[in-house]
């Protein structure tokens, strides 16, 4: 039996159970009451049989029969309780979602759906029962997820602390090529002199972000130890840097400008010239502007489209500006006040049709009218830029780790509470028939 078949343990269990229930036996009986549901002897026997088959094929030891039966019974009780919760929440897994899940399983196994059906049949598993057990599993999982999510609270400081730990681990082997400018604040300087130096440092940062040459500014202004080398410190790991540098450099990518920041001797500015060994995350942001016209009982799709076509022609002909037309026509009050401008955003923020337009439209081109769920639009891409999101990606990773930890803890607690609050009566099983 292929490895993947072991992951279908639950499916096989219910397939075998269905087979045994298809030919009723006198010995089949209710063995456990779980609130208003029942667990049958055939359910227990089917699961015991399947567990033993899988254990034998994988050469795994099993506990004695009494303990194994107890474990099987507990699994059936927990599943029943979760399905009862799902029914209370009105959770239903429709055929479309089920089809997608089955297709995903087939894809993971590098099989087509017909091939998956044949593999199941070879193992004695009915495809229809396979689908229904998947529906049960998905239903129970969704009920569990809904309830457990409500119990999880992740504080921002928890994310920050874990992200910092992850970042330190990541940076142990990373090398940075950095340059540095130091503006000295003399001992005994007045408040006005300190503020003047701070303003000068900020002005230098602004110039650097607008493309000024770092080395030239270092020659002109820096009082640091590498001023005569254009401020360049070369390649260093974080642990090799002066502490004041190491404290500021996190997961900064190539080209990052850091500062100005203060120390006991003055203000500092760092540029990351290059990085070795750091996996950075970069995203493209788009600054676009649009005009949205929503349809209504008095404005049809054709009417909205014609209005935008006329506005587009007026803008292209120079008779109107985009900003004026947006303020006059747009049904999006937030952007209309800004001449239709949406600001810097990642395309993923938008609905699919709008996302596709701003990803493919050449800069400075006004699109033809197109429709989304919000209405009819014309859009112009003003500019694009690549933005380093490594720090945000690290925080996202930290959040996911914390969520996973807490979810597992809270899921166990929820299941225990669910079981403790349920009416469960075990009527006793027959002698093991396996």
From Swiss-Prot:
Keywords: Chaperone, Isomerase, Periplasm, Repeat, Rotamase, Signal. Gene3D superfamilies: 3.10.50.40, Porin chaperone SurA, peptide-binding domain. One of its GO terms (cellular component) is outer membrane-bounded periplasmic space. HAMAP family: Chaperone_SurA (MF_01183). This is Chaperone SurA. Disulfide bonds: none annotated. InterPro entries: OMP_Chaperone_SurA (IPR050280), PPIase_dom_sf (IPR046357), PPIase_PpiC (IPR000297), PPIase_SurA (IPR023034), SurA_N (IPR015391), Trigger_fact/SurA_dom_sf (IPR027304). GO terms for molecular function: peptide binding; peptidyl-prolyl cis-trans isomerase activity; unfolded protein binding. It catalyses: [protein]-peptidylproline (omega=180) = [protein]-peptidylproline (omega=0). The PPIase activity resides only in the second parvulin domain. The N-terminal region and the C-terminal tail are necessary and sufficient for the chaperone activity of SurA. The PPIase activity is dispensable for SurA to function as a chaperone. The N-terminal region and the C-terminal tail are also required for porin recognition. It comes from Photobacterium profundum (strain SS9).
């Amino acid at each position: 039996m292929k490895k993947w078949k072991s992951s279908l343990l639950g499916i096989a269990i219910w397939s075998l159970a269905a087979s045994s229930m298809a030919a009723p036996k006198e010995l089949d009986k209710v063995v456990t009451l779980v609130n208003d549901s029942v667990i049958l002897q055939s359910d227990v026997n089917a699961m015991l049989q399947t567990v033993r088959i899988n254990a034998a094929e994988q050469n795994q030891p099993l506990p004695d029969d009494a303990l194994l039966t107890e474990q099987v019974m507990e699994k059936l009780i927990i599943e029943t309780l979760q399905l009862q919760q799902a029914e209370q929440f009105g959770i239903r897994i429709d055929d479309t979602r089920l089809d997608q899940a089955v297709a995903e399983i087939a894809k993971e196994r590098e099989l087509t759906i017909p091939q998956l059906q044949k593999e199941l049949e070879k193992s004695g598993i009915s495809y229809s029962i396979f689908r229904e057990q998947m529906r049960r599993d998905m239903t129970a999982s969704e009920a569990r997820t809904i309830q457990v999510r409500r119990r999880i609270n992740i504080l921002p400081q928890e994310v920050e602390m874990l992200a910092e730990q992850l970042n330190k681990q990541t940076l142990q082997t990373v090398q940075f090529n950095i340059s540095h400018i130091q503006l000295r604040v003399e001992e005994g300087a007045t408040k006005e002199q300190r503020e003047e130096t701070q303003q000068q440092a900020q002005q230098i940062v602004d110039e650097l972000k607008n493309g000024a040459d770092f080395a030239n500014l270092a020659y002109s202004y820096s009082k640091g130890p590498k001023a005569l080398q254009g401020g360049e410190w070369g390649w260093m790991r974080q642990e090799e840097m002066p502490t004041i540098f190491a404290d500021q450099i996190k997961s900064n990518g190539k080209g990052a400008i850091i500062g100005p920041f203060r120390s006991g001797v003055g203000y500092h500015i760092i540029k990351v010239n290059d990085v070795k060994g750091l996996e950075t995350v970069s995203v493209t942001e788009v600054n676009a502007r649009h005009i949205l016209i929503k349809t209504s009982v008095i404005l049809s799709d054709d009417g909205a489209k014609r209005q935008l076509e006329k506005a587009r022609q007026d803008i292209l002909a120079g008779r109107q500006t985009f900003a004026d037309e947006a303020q006059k026509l747009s049904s999006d009050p937030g952007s209309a006040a800004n001449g239709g401008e949406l600001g810097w955003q990642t395309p993923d923020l938008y609905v699919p049709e709008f996302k596709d337009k701003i990803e493919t439209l050449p800069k400075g081109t006004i699109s033809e009218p197109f429709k989304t769920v919000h209405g009819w639009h014309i859009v112009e891409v003003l500019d694009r830029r690549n933005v380093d999101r490594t720090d945000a990606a690290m925080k996202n990773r930290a959040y996911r780790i914390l969520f996973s930890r807490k979810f597992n803890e809270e899921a166990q607690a929820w299941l225990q509470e669910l079981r403790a609050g349920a009416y469960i009566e075990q009527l006793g099983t027959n002698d093991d028939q396996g």
